[in-house]
Amino acid sequence: MSREVLSPPVQAMSQNRRYRVNIVHEDFGGDKWNGQNKGSKRQNQAYEEPDLYGEDDDEDDPAASNIEESPNGDFKLALHVPKSFYGGLIGLKGSTKRRIEEETRTEIYVPRQNEKSNDVVIRGKQRSQLCAALRQIRHLITSLRKKMKPTHFLAVAMNSGEVQKRFVELKKSILEAQLPGIDEELFMPERSIHLTLGVYVLLDDDERQRALKELEACRPLLADLKTPFEMKVKGLEIMNDDPSFTRILYGRVESPELQKFADQCLSHFQGTGLCATDNNERESIKLHMTLMNNRYRKEAMKAGNSFDAREILKRFGDFDFGAAQCQAVHLCVLKSRGEDEFYKISGSLQF
């Protein structure tokens, strides 16, 4: 048996990774293919990871169209990146930035915190190198965004008309019943009741404006739907299985047309990279109107992380809030209050 088969040349990929270099007949590359020359010592070359995607895949990223070629033949890309991602992009002592630069053979400049520009600048000798760096930065940002708390949500306001009036009546009836562990702080403010159609992480004005453009891009989805959306709110349910340890109590919402639109919007935004983790992991929006939430309590830690909703469900489980129409969806700021005591609205899709 050939000695070359038993003891083939080995290529070091990293500190703990070694791979055999296959022997190829010279008609198919031979020694040249294996990086060896007959009669000469083997030359050490840095391992270069093969690009399994190709430039065409990177062209799907709109930012790739902004790559510029300089007079000396080099390439440059200015990429908008919110400052909140700078720490993760740089890494401990610059390790992450340095790794991307080495793997893609590019130079990456990250603005300092006191600089006005939010553009990360990527430079390289070849366009494909910039595309590879762009792809890695995009993947890194997606990973970092998953770890961040949501900042905005898509909402249908329910704070007017019959539904709001009936909510006030239900709240009064529950409080008058003087049920153990139930107090006014558990209830959603009457001017803030809403449906949530999506939750996002938007870290600067550029991302907020982009989210509004994506929301407007959902307008064609309305063409095959009947608007305004008719909604009926009837019955009470809880998010968990045990009503004696309830965290969220909500009103059931029936609206087939709104459900279709909400699910289509969810699918659209999942492709934008702006969704919070919860939205990326779901296939459908659960239409519901939150009525009571233990997190609303100022003393939530002292009172425990749940409340007993058994008697509420027994007495008011079939409560009818009436009907409403949805004529707009709003991009709202989480944990905020506008002039009308609803959430601050960044923009809306009217229909």
Residue positions per predicted region:
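Histidine-dependent nucleotide/RNA phosphoesterase domain, centered on the 2H-phosphoesterase fold
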Residues: 2-351
